[in-house]
A protein has these predicted regions:
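Short glycine/serine/threonine-rich phosphate/pyrophosphate-binding segments
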Residues: 32-34, 54-58, 78-87, 91, ...
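Anionic-ligand anchoring segments at beta-strand to alpha-helix junctions in alpha/beta enzyme folds, i.e.
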Residues: 22-60, 73, 102, 189, ...
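Phosphate/pyrophosphate-binding active-site segments
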Residues: 1-3, 140, 292, 296-356
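Glycine-rich beta-alpha junction loops
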Residues: 28-31, 104-105, 165-171, 213-215, ...
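Aromatic-enriched
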Residues: 167-192, 337-338, 349, 353-354
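Structural signature of the thiamine diphosphate
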Residues: 22-23, 64-101, 127-178, 200, ...
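Active-site diphosphate/adenylate-binding microenvironment
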Residues: 8-13, 18, 27-30, 35-40, ...
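Short gly/pro/ser/thr-enriched loop/turn and capping motifs at secondary-structure boundaries
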Residues: 53-56, 80-81, 104-109, 170, ...
């Protein structure tokens, strides 16, 4: 490959070479053609739907199935706005998506004199549904911004990231981009927090686990933890499949039922892992659960810890790593009450829905 590339080609080359991107979703056009120009040389597959909304949902689905960030390559203006719904969906469901969209040439940014597909401020348009959204007028900032995006995807709560790149910047010549290596680690709770949490778990007589989408990569750790404390596990919609439906402690997606909610509120300990406890999970008229006992909340997003409830202990950390550390720190229980409770809830759900 030549030492000099168009910026658009250099972006794809960097994503392929350093971040393992092998597929992108979008529709090529005159505005973003430089991003497509070098796809074949990088071995990256381009999948083009009929509409950018489809590209966004494909990228979102890609992240669900592969565990990798979905990448959208879009044109400015309507290309981006067509994809707003899947971007918002990925934001709501905490899934990684990189949106690279062309935008108005640098000399026309914010001028509003009518260039094709102009928006007053493209980056601002999507900022509220992205971890960050930037307009990139200096091509040399791109490696740092792409690294920053991957740090969001891998060490924070995953969320979409949008980079708006003016057409003239995409067309500039540059040397191949080199990866900017930065230290990024998922947060780990303090030893004192683990100690207090372990004390609460060891003292509990009927612990319950509510697991959300933050557990999607922590199924094995969740199972071991639940088995160690004999706790029934209620799954939110975003956590379906995290724990096998055949596991005796799996109560399934039954949080919508009033009886289950009342049992949870009466428990002496509820451990909430990686979930917002949102209206969509509860379907109870927008009311938060009124926990009668202690609450332990585990989430990679610190802001989530005090939303909808005030926990007795809040642990900021990755679900899998935190559950593993707790499993090693607690006393293993030998009762079967948790299995019986999970069975009771499963039977209640079947009776309410008429499921076989």
């Amino acid at each position: 490959m030549s030492d000099q590339l168009r910026v658009g080609e250099a972006i794809i080359d960097l994503l392929s070479r350093e971040y393992g991107v092998d597929t992108v979703f979008g529709i090529p056009g005159v505005h973003n053609i430089e991003l497509y120009r070098g796809l074949h040389r990088s071995g990256v597959r381009a999948i083009s739907p009929r509409h950018e909304q489809g590209a966004g949902f494909m990228a979102d689905g890609w992240s669900v199935i592969t565990g990798k960030p979905g990448v959208c390559v879009l044109i400015s203006g309507p290309g981006l706005t067509n994809a707003l719904t899947p971007i918002a969906q990925a934001y709501h469901d905490s899934r990684p998506m990189l949106i690279i969209a062309s935008t108005t040439p640098t000399n026309a940014l914010g001028k509003s004199f009518g260039p094709l597909h102009d928006l007053p401020d493209q980056a601002a348009l999507v900022r509220s549904i992205c971890a960050f959204s930037e307009t990139v007028t200096d091509a040399q900032e791109l490696p740092q911004l792409i690294e920053r995006a991957w740090n969001v995807f891998t060490s924070q709560r995953p969320r979409p990231v949008h980079l708006a790149i003016p057409m003239d910047v995409l067309e500039q010549m540059c040397a191949r981009f080199e990866k900017v290596d930065t230290e990024a680690h998922r947060p780990v709770p303090a030893a004192s927090e683990f100690k207090r949490t372990a004390e609460l778990i060891n003292a509990a007589t009927n612990p319950i686990v509510i697991a959300g989408g933050g557990c999607v990569d922590a199924g094995a750790q969740l199972a071991k933890f639940a088995e160690a404390i004999d706790a029934p596990v209620v799954l939110t919609g975003n956590a379906k499949g995290v724990l096998s439906s055949t596991h005796p402690l799996c109560a399934g997606n039954c949080l919508v039922f009033g009886r289950v909610q009342r049992d949870i509120e009466a428990a002496d300990l509820v451990i909430v892992v990686g979930t917002e406890l949102s209206d969509a999970d509860l379907y109870n008229g927008g009311q938060a659960l009124q926990f009668g006992g202690n609450v332990i909340r585990i989430d990679i997003d610190e802001e989530q810890l005090a939303r909808r409830t005030t926990p007795t202990v809040g642990l900021v950390g990755d679900a899998g790593e935190t559950l593993s550390s707790l499993t090693a720190a607690i006393h293993t229980k030998t009762s079967t009450a948790g299995r019986e409770q999970a069975k009771t809830w499963r039977e209640h759900a079947r009776a309410k829905t008429g499921a076989q």
